UniProtKB/Swiss-Prot annotation:
This is Ribosomal RNA small subunit methyltransferase H. GO terms for biological process: rRNA base methylation. Residues 298-351 are annotated as: Disordered. The keyword Hydrolase does not apply. It comes from Methylorubrum populi (strain ATCC BAA-705 / NCIMB 13946 / BJ001) (Methylobacterium populi). The lineage of its organism: Bacteria, Pseudomonadati, Pseudomonadota, Alphaproteobacteria, Hyphomicrobiales. GO terms for molecular function: rRNA (cytosine-N4-)-methyltransferase activity. Belongs to the methyltransferase superfamily. RsmH family. Its EC number is 2.1.1.199.
């Protein structure tokens, strides 16, 4: 999803919204190696930055762009009109991209790009409830369906809230935050982002000199839980593996350590760098066909110049792989486990 350009002070740069530059754009295009006509899939359309760059890579490039957010699909209408039939916008989840492609009459793709997480448009619209910097309803749903963040905050048990904040948000004070939430909601429901942010700020003290808001990690954890973002990532990796042609490339940009760990383990296992555990014999490692060749040997990070212009890019990491002609193995249970809340005994150290 396209992240809006930012000045060093965090204010939106003067640019047309349609021309938002995605994070690591040049690096993603280089990793994809767009050297021939073909079909590219942008699994996370957002503001259309990657899609636009894919279309501009050559006159014969065709693109199918996917987004679960109906607002993003509507906003992309002008881009579709200007693409001369080379762009199709599809509302749906990128975890279903193989099914969505089949619905479009396409069995395979040459390239897939996934930009994981919340988009600039979602963060910058207060009524969507993603940002602790703007007051709005506590929603956080990317597609508008299912339980909202308010439903989780006001309805989940304290222990479950603590697990969400710790595992998905990496908030070390998750138990204290969960306890404060439960105590506050006994008095009145927590309905807005400002209410929740103020509550968290009273529990989590920022480190001296840190630019990170005390509510950052808790909001991240809730957002990931509301949208099942890690489960969607796991499904998207496997779906991309199924649709890519031999020689096709997959590029994935992540912004969270657990997201990156999932992508790293996926490429490591599928390229033969790590053994893949057998589903039928848990704990038994077995060789598996290599379905990917690594394009990036480690994570590609944004340049200092990019992070100065766009502070949101500072945690971005890019990993990419090239599809071999080997069959797609069964889904990796190890990364499916990473995408789920751990068992109680695996919660780790929290306060």
């Amino acid at each position: 999803m396209s992240r809006a350009p930012r000045t060093a002070k965090g204010e939106t740069a003067r640019a047309e919204p349609a021309r938002h530059v995605p994070v690591l754009l040049a690096e993603v295009l280089a990793a994809l190696a767009l050297d021939r006509p073909g079909l590219a899939v942008d699994g996370t359309f957002g503001a259309g930055g990657y899609t636009r760059a894919l279309l501009e890579s050559g006159p014969d490039m065709r693109v199918i762009a996917i987004d679960r957010d109906p607002t993003a699909i509507r906003a992309g209408a002008d881009l579709v009109e200007g693409a001369g039939g080379r762009l199709r916008l599809v509302q749906g989840r990128f975890g279903d991209l193989d099914t969505l492609l089949a619905d479009q009459g396409e069995a395979q793709a040459d390239w897939v790009v996934l930009d994981i997480g919340v988009s600039s448009m979602q963060l910058d619209e207060a009524h969507r409830g993603f940002s602790f910097r703007q007051d709005g309803p506590l929603d956080m749903r990317m597609g508008g369906e299912g339980p909202s963040a308010a439903d989780l905050v006001n309805g989940e048990e304290e222990s479950t809230l603590a697990d969400i904040l710790y595992h998905f948000g990496e908030e070390r004070r998750s138990r204290a935050v969960a306890r404060a939430i439960v105590e506050a909601r006994r008095r009145a429901p927590i309905a807005t982002t400002a209410q929740l942010a103020d509550l968290i700020a009273g529990v989590v003290r920022p480190e001296p000199g840190s630019p990170i808001h005390p509510a950052t990690r808790s909001f991240q954890g809730l957002r990931i839980a509301v949208n099942d973002e890690l489960g969607e990532l796991v499904r998207g990796l496997h779906a991309a593996e199924r649709v890519l042609k031999p020689g096709g490339r997959l590029a994935v940009v992540t912004f969270h350590s657990l997201e990156d760990r999932i992508v790293k383990q996926f490429f490591s296992a599928r390229s033969g760098r790590a053994a893949q555990a057998s589903r039928h014999l848990p704990g038994v490692e077995r060789p598996a066909p290599k379905s990917f060749r690594l394009v990036t040997k480690g994570p590609v990070l944004p340049s200092e110049a990019e992070t100065e212009v766009n502070p949101r890019a500072r945690s971005a990491k890019l990993r990419a792989g090239e599809r071999t002609d080997g069959p797609a193995p069964p889904p990796l249970s190890a990364i499916e486990t990473l995408a789920s809340l751990p068992a109680p005994q695996g919660r780790g150290t929290r306060r």
